[in-house]
């Protein structure tokens, strides 16, 4: 389902080599940061970034440059006690939060939010309160959709192909393909 998105993201230079395979496997926090950092750098070249916090950030369990860039820009947070947990897989609601924070860095991306979901997912009660406004935003922007059968699956694993497709949608407001369910 995601082949066109993967091809388009590759053509735009948004798919780092470490995530350019095993597309149906869950994505780790570190690998998601590699995608987010690619978008961040592309926007920086296009001069569309808002002024972002770029304070010094460090973690005891990683010194990966993409992780540190995303953390200093406010796209991702640590997990506590100075750790990032780079090898931990992310959930769909965590991805929504990270995508929203990344989108907020682009001065051309509309960033209005509220906690009320525009669509009532059958599993909406499972969406955590901290993720509601982020899921609302990514859904309304057409960046993330449900997983089929009127579900969002907030605690479900987020795959590499889903990550590539949604970071491409966020990056390119001229995205010509209709978003599909992230099966």
Question: What is the role of each PLM region?
Answer:
Residues 135:
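Catalytic cores of secreted/periplasmic or lumenal enzymes
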Residues 1-3, 10-33, 37-66, 73-93, ...:
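Feature responds to low-complexity, polar/acidic, surface-exposed segments characteristic
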């Amino acid at each position: 389902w995601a082949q066109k998105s993967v091809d388009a993201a590759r053509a735009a230079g948004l798919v780092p080599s470490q995530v350019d395979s095993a597309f149906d496997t869950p994505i780790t926090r570190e690998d998601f940061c590699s995608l987010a950092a690619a978008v961040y750098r592309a926007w920086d070249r296009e001069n569309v970034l808002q002024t972002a916090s770029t304070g010094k950030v460090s973690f005891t369990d990683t010194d990966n440059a993409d992780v540190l860039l995303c953390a200093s820009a406010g796209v991702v947070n640590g997990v506590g006690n100075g750790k990032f947990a780079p090898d931990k897989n992310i959930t769909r609601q965590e991805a929504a939060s990270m995508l929203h924070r990344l989108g907020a860095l682009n001065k051309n991306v509309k960033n209005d939010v509220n906690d009320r979901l525009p669509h009532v997912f059958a599993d909406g009660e499972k969406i955590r309160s901290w993720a509601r406004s982020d899921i609302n935003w990514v859904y309304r922007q057409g960046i993330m959709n449900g997983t089929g059968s009127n579900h969002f699956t907030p605690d479900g694993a987020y795959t590499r192909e889903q990550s590539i497709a949604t970071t491409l949608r966020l990056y390119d407001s001229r995205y010509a393909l209709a978003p599909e369910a992230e099966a």
